[in-house]
């Protein structure tokens, strides 16, 4: 969202919203199922779906145990996919309603794809939307800002982000504890600070 960084040590950090990530609003629904299937996380790239403003179209499904009532377990099936690009000049509205259009898109995807979907369709138990960030190259950024190593990044959703977030958190914890992790594809790069002076 909107932040201010006072930098007394290193190059100025560009705080524009889209410097390292592009903002989108992602829409998800969740359904309670019997706990008779294992946990899963799957991405789908339907061939018959129009390309979105973000340049890709995919749906994602996660299934995991969930305890709604005490000592009564269900599978929580979460499905997302529809997105709307968030221009830099526009603020994300947390309280805006869940669009019927996106609910219909998710329901159509579930009816066509999810084998456990009942014949009369699945009724959503939960609906929500949230701000998501995508890096320009599709690869998560984890580690110190090259021009100002006091700023640590763990940026980029780029699909199902649960496991990469955990991995990123572990790398950040190593940096904070004084250990320098081995170089990886996730290291932030900024050629301004890598050129010889």
Q: Residue spans of the language-model regions?
A:
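Short Gly/Pro-enriched turn/cap motifs at secondary-structure boundaries
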Residues: 17-23, 42-53, 123, 129-133
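Short loop/turn segments at secondary-structure transitions that flank enzyme active sites
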Residues: 3, 35, 67, 85, ...
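Short, solvent-exposed loop/turn segments that connect beta-strands within catalytic domains
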Residues: 37, 66-74
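Short beta-strand micro-motifs enriched in acidic
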Residues: 62-66, 144-145
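Extended catalytic-interface subdomain
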Residues: 1, 7-8, 28-29, 42-64, ...
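Short, solvent-exposed loop/turn segments at the edges of secondary structure
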Residues: 22-24, 54-56, 72, 137
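C-terminal catalytic lobe of FAD-dependent flavoproteins
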Residues: 72-75, 81-197
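Central helical "cap/lid" subdomain
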Residues: 1-40
